[in-house]
Swiss-Prot record:
Gene of this entry: tusA
UniProt-annotated location(s): Cytoplasm
Pfam families on file: TusA
Residues at the catalytic site: C17
Annotated GO CC locations: cytoplasm
Identification of the protein by name: Sulfur carrier protein TusA
GO MF term set: sulfur carrier activity
Biological process according to GO: tRNA wobble position uridine thiolation
Length: 82
């Protein structure tokens, strides 16, 4: 598998819902389309909230690791329409 280029990292360890999603939204708002954000979290609610956020806000959840803590999510700003 090709290694993902990470442009930004957001550490939300210790934060609980809704803070991880609020910080994700704030961070992505300041990113350029196509950039990738790595989100690191330990709140079990993020396993539901981050994928839902991506779908609702039209971002791509490229990859996630939710088997063990800390959870990791790779989110690309915007959607590829090719």
């Amino acid at each position: 598998m090709t290694e993902l280029t990470i442009n930004h990292t957001l550490d939300t360890l210790g934060l609980r819902c809704p803070e991880p999603v609020m910080l994700t939204r704030k961070t992505i708002r300041n990113m350029a389309d196509g950039e990738v954000l790595l989100i690191i979290a330990d709140d079990p609610a993020t396993t539901r909230d981050i994928p839902s956020f991506c779908q609702f806000m039209d971002h791509q959840l490229l990859k996630s690791q939710t088997d063990t803590k800390p959870y990791q999510y790779w989110v690309k700003k915007g959607l590829d329409h090719l």
